[in-house]
Amino acid sequence: MQPLQLSPIEQQEFDRLLESLHPEQKDLIPGSVIGPFLLKFGLPQKILAKIWDYCDQEDKGSLDRNQVYACFRLISQAQRGATLQELDYNKAGDPPILPKQAKDDHHIKRSSSETADFTPFRIPINPDERSEYEKEFRENLRGHEDSARPGCMPSSIAKPILLKSSLHYAVLAQIWNLADSAHVGYLEMYQYVIARHLVAICKQYNLIHLPRSLPADVIESAKSETPAMNTNIEQGVTQPSLVNTEQLSHQQSISSTKSSKLDEISADNNAQSAVDNKYSSPPQTIDPQANIKALITPEDRSNFYQLFSKIDNENKGYIVGGEAVPFFMASHLDSEELARIWDTVDTQDRGYIDKDEFAVAMEIIKLRLSGKSLASILAYDDNPTEPTMQQNLVSDDTNASTAVPVAFTNDNVSNVPLSVADNEPNSTLNLLASSDTAAFEPTAVSLHENPSSSLEDLQSAFQNTSFQDQVSTQNQANTADISQNTESGSSTQGQMFGIPPTTQSIPLKMAGFPGGVNSSLTDIKEEEAVSENAPQQEERSFEQIKTSIHIAPENISAIEESKSVPLPTSFATTIPGSTSAALDDQQTTEAPFEEPDEPAHEPTEEEQEEMRKLEEKIESTKYGLETIQTSGKTIKQRIEQKKTRLMILREELQELDAIKEEAQKQISQSLIADQQLSTQIGSVGMGKKQAVKELRKLQAKIDSIIADSMSPMGTGAVNSPAIKPQVTPAPPTPAPTPAVKHHPPPPPVRSSISPSMPPAPLTHANSSTPMNYVSQPESPPQSYESIQNDNELLQELLSMGFPREKAVIALEATNYDVNEAANILLSSV
């Protein structure tokens, strides 16, 4: 890898990151040191693995300083949205960002977004700039317009355009939240103009924090003269993140008038914040996360971490809004509350949260479901959208506000549902002010000091108030009514203590549970058996009634007229009898418990609907479990089949190995035999060469003989037995007569050895040879059979096409062996 040319900023930041590792060898960092450090940048492990492969091309398992620089560059590009194909370590850019560093800075001080100067974001959009962005909007939308949302650009087109700006994805998430505040996944023309305008501002001023809302004049400057299709950008002040949250859009119902006021309030707050930040230190505010973290129990924290691990299946160390919102939606909280919860934990508007922030969000949701309002949980309201419950109460009766019990003070006033203020007259506060609240202080304190208590704890807190304390305040009817009107009890319980049934009461309902504190547990406890200590509790309760209260005769008739009403959840029976005698009998005799004629609680339509949904969910879960079990069995069968197949393949492999060994042995034997044959062939070749030499010598001899025989002066051929004329004794010639004086010439001598024509004897008269030749002794004549055999051998060679002269010589040389003669003639060809 060639040395990289780093910019001054990159050189400084890369060296700082390397110094934070404290490696033993600064020029060679092992993978065990640099690997865990790279995981802190928040990228998926698959991308980090590819980046490592790009840098460690030699697979050494360690990186030198130049390779670490290249790794930092690639991580920075990946953080800014570059794909794996677009990564290039030769391209300079901004240093990478450590999410952990931003988290540590948040624990030290408030986010810089609270003290940042948002002045550039208050500048209205220039008409020329708006026209340019509108033209760009039309060009990119042409041919891609959705028929369901005409005139709107889908996120699949808008987001790639924004990614070309090379801004960090966290900054782009904030820009998208401000543009598509309703989170419908589409941008209108003016929203696209706002998004492009914010991109230009962030690039020009190098900003990474954006305000949570834009001033109204900036939004208006993004709109052209033509009215927009809708105004969903004004339908929210703060939204969680850059995610597809169409599930939330149908729940938003804030009016445009109300939102415009909020925009003005937000603009004023931003302006005032800028002035305060410029001339003074940042305001000290209460961090809700610190308070809520202290409320999380170790068991809950462990459960929240497990849920976080299931959502973060890639082990990134954080989850984005698209992963968290569907999970948070299961709480059935309002979308505005979920958005507020998200903003509470994502204080830097990064668009993602870690597991600690996720635990805080889950704890807030848990507290919210327990009945506490979001404002009381967070201990302050950053962006109030409507008057608080406390203001409504004070406007009704300012004198009574100081007499409200502890449970309804500033931090807990929102626990009172809206139905209290709407349905009860002003006398309600007077009743609270004039009543003795000592009996209710334990309940109030338990709610205030331990807001994370479970629903069962809340129920027991209301039930632990002794009946003796309630009876001691029987003349204070209003206070008794407060304790008597929990959902588990009935309004007629006050009649037992001599209180008229017409007295108004305040139901202690908790926000989020329409049926009251105990209603959330009613459906669950209806199917459970009666507690074992229920008889003892009722017996003790009646003993307290017997010893602490005297029922007036006029109240007995009221008891007789009243219907059988169930006691609170702790009790399982009603008061038997309707006369004072029956009551006296019940005080002295332990009467058996009787089941009430009417059910203790008739489920409402909403509860029935919820129960139906739960049943459907249970059935769906059962079906899912059955499907999983079936799939598990199928997978198990496939595994067994694959194991069997693997065993078969192993056996076949062993057989193939045996065949291979046998083939190798045969090949070795064949090679040995081949070598032996080669040796034999070599020896045969040597013999052949020797035979050829001998044949050549013999051929030379034959050629010399033939040459001698063809020479006219040669005598070799004459003396040869093969061509030597046969001399036969001439028949006796008659004696010449004297009368004959001239003899005719003799016939010519034939050189044939044919027995039919024997050669004529040579005489002195007709022979040209010397006389001594004639007088030489002649060889004995051959037999007729021998001559006949020699002629047959000669004819056989002649039939093979050999010349006659050479055939005769070859027969002579081989002693008339026709095979040897043929070989000699063939070698001489």
Curated annotation (Swiss-Prot):
SS bonds (residue pairs): none
| Polar residues: compositionally biased ranges | 466-506, 574-590, 764-774
Ranges annotated as biased composition (Low complexity): 775-785
Q: Tell me the keywords, alphabetical order.
A: Coiled coil, Phosphoprotein, Repeat
Tell me where in this chain the PTM Phosphoserine is found.
S112, S113
Q: Which residues form the UBA domain?
A: 788-828
Region described as Disordered: spans on this chain: 93-121, 466-520, 574-614, 724-785
**UniProt-listed SMART domains:** EH (SM00027), UBA (SM00165)
Q: Which GO terms describe its biological process?
A: actin cortical patch assembly; endocytosis; endosomal transport; intracellular protein transport
**EF-hand domain sequence ranges:** 43-78, 333-368
Any idea where the EH domain is?
A: 10-109, 129-225, 300-398
Q: Which GO terms describe its cellular component?
A: actin cortical patch; cytoplasm; plasma membrane
Q: Which InterPro entries match?
A: EF-hand-dom_pair (IPR011992), EF_hand_dom (IPR002048), EH_dom (IPR000261), UBA (IPR015940), UBA-like_sf (IPR009060)
Annotated Pro residues bias:
728-737
Coiled coil region boundaries: 602-709
One example of the protein's molecular function in GO is:
calcium ion binding
Superkingdom? Eukaryota
- Return the protein name: UBA domain-containing protein 8
Originating organism: Schizosaccharomyces pombe (strain 972 / ATCC 24843) (Fission yeast)
